[in-house]
Curated annotation (Swiss-Prot):
The protein, known as: Cyclic di-GMP phosphodiesterase PA4781
Positions contributing to a divalent metal cation 1 binding: H180, H220, D221
Catalytic reaction list: 3',3'-c-di-GMP + 2 H2O = 2 GMP + 2 H(+)
InterPro entries in alphabetical order: CheY-like_superfamily, Cyclic_di-GMP/3'3'-cGAMP_PDE, HD/PDEase_dom, HD_GYP_dom, Sig_transdc_resp-reg_receiver
TM segment ranges: none
Residues with 4-aspartylphosphate modification: D61
Gene3D superfamilies: 3.40.50.2300, Hypothetical protein af1432 (1.10.3210.10)
Description of the deletion phenotype: Disruption mutant has increased levels of cyclic di-GMP. Mutation leads to reduction in both swarming and twitching motility, to an increase in pyoverdine production, and a reduction in virulence. It produces a biofilm with little heterogeneity.
Superkingdom in the source lineage: Bacteria
Enzyme Commission identifier(s): 3.1.4.-
GO MF annotations, alphabetized: cyclic-guanylate-specific phosphodiesterase activity; metal ion binding
Positions of a divalent metal cation 2 binding: D221, H249, H281, H282
Lineage, broadest ranks: Bacteria, Pseudomonadati, Pseudomonadota, Gammaproteobacteria, Pseudomonadales
Subunit and partners: Homodimer.
Length: 393
């Protein structure tokens, strides 16, 4: 769309009239102050109206053979390129009904013939000024809209970067080379988008909610920053005290995110999802999970979705203490958990998108380097545990 800054200083007026003398008269009257373009028929006027640069104002004779001024006006107002150009009718008709018809079609003024030069110049100047004001407001509005979009994109990019940084803090405790987080984000999106197409979930899983849920899933283990390495990385059986420490990561994550939500001072869909997920993604459908032993739909939907995605990732990822399961085996195990570990409806959705899960697992598989790092960290954790449990000399 043409900006006011791109326009020449002198406005362009298009005059459409089938009488050459009238065209000459209007040109002589206007050309000292404006650029003037003329057309001798309705069709010629339509062509002239879309030529670049487009006119700022159109003076249009009503009584023309073939295509009269009213029809020209209708077509101009129907064309997105010309509908906002102000149009003034010129006519020898003095009938009030004719004037009402012209104004109803979108004309801004109605001038009688023979024209009065001072009145024509005054009306032309008035309508050009009105158009300039309208264009200024439109351009300013467009600029502000573009600026808001730009700022929104910047804030979104900043938010995404902060989310990734925070999520990585938690993931670093397990394995800094793992691609667990990119996989989880994509698994959650696949499940949520499939569920969103079902009536039972459509209200809760709007497109915006799916985006927020996918991103907030990255923070599911943020509370692990509060768990000692010797507990977090211990491949063996934990005692009761260490089990409590490990399970405490759900409360630590929830409390940190709840604190952020309070400091924000207003509701945040992202933080709400993140808090629910961090606290409840280890709950089970049958109520045998932790930290609260919630069952069924008392477990937030976001947490139920992440629980299934996280379980699939655990089963199909390479670990230092065990090889990954094949995709088909993982699918069977998750199906077996329907009604006990997982919401049965989510398991149905998972089966429907299982091939896409397999593709994500393949594309974002951990490298051999990630496995080496995990092995080193496990060895360090075991050594630390031995030191802590060794009897004093």
């Amino acid at each position: 769309m043409e900006s006011m800054l791109d326009r020449p200083e002198q406005e362009l007026v298009l005059v459409v009239d089938d009488t050459p003398d009238n065209l000459l008269l209007m040109r002589e009257l206007l050309e000292e102050q404006y650029r003037v373009r003329t057309a001798g028929s309705g069709p010629a006027g339509l062509r002239a109206a879309v030529e670049e640069p487009r006119p700022d104002l159109i003076l249009l004779d009503v009584n023309m053979p073939g295509m009269d001024g009213y029809e020209v006006c209708r077509r101009l107002k129907a064309d997105p390129l010309t509908r906002d150009i102000p149009l003034m009718f010129l006519t020898a008709r003095a009938d009030r009904d004719d004037e009402q018809q012209g104004l109803a079609l979108g004309a801004v003024d109605y001038l009688g013939k023979p024209v009065s030069p001072p009145i024509v110049l005054a009306r032309v100047r008035t309508h050009l000024q009105l158009k300039a004001n309208a264009d200024f407001l439109r351009d300013k509005s467009e600029y502000l809209e573009l600026e808001v979009r730009r700022r929104t994109r910047q804030l979104q990019q900043l938010q995404d970067a902060v989310i990734e940084a925070l999520a990585t803090l938690g993931d670093l405790r397990d394995n800094p080379r793992s691609r667990h987080l990119p996989r989880i984000e994509r698994y959650v999106r696949l499940l949520a988008e499939h569920l969103a197409a079902q009536r039972a979930f459509a209200d809760e899983l709007t497109p915006e909610a799916v985006d927020l849920l996918s991103k907030s899933a990255l923070l599911h283990d943020i509370g692990k920053v509060a768990v000692p390495d010797r507990v977090l990385l211990n491949p063996g059986q934990l005692d009761a005290a260490d089990t409590a420490l490990l399970q405490g990561h759900t409360r630590a994550g929830r409390d940190a995110l709840a604190s952020a939500e309070r400091r924000l001072g207003q509701p945040s869909g992202f933080l709400r999802f993140a808090r629910q997920i961090a606290y409840s993604h280890h709950e089970r459908w049958d109520g045998r999970g932790f930290p609260e032993g919630l069952a069924g739909e008392r477990i937030p939907l976001a947490a139920r979705i992440v629980a299934l995605a996280d379980r699939y990732d655990e089963l199909t990822s390479r670990h230092a203490y065990r090889p990954p399961l094949a995709h088909a085996e993982a699918v069977l195990l998750i199906q077996a958990g329907a009604g006990s570990e997982f919401d049965p409806r989510l398991v149905e959705a998972f089966v429907a998108v299982a091939d896409a899960f397999a593709e994500v697992a393949r594309r974002y598989a951990d490298s051999a380097e990630a496995l080496d790092v995990e092995m080193q960290r496990l060895e360090q954790a075991v050594a630390e545990s031995i030191e802590l449990t060794a009897p004093p000399a």
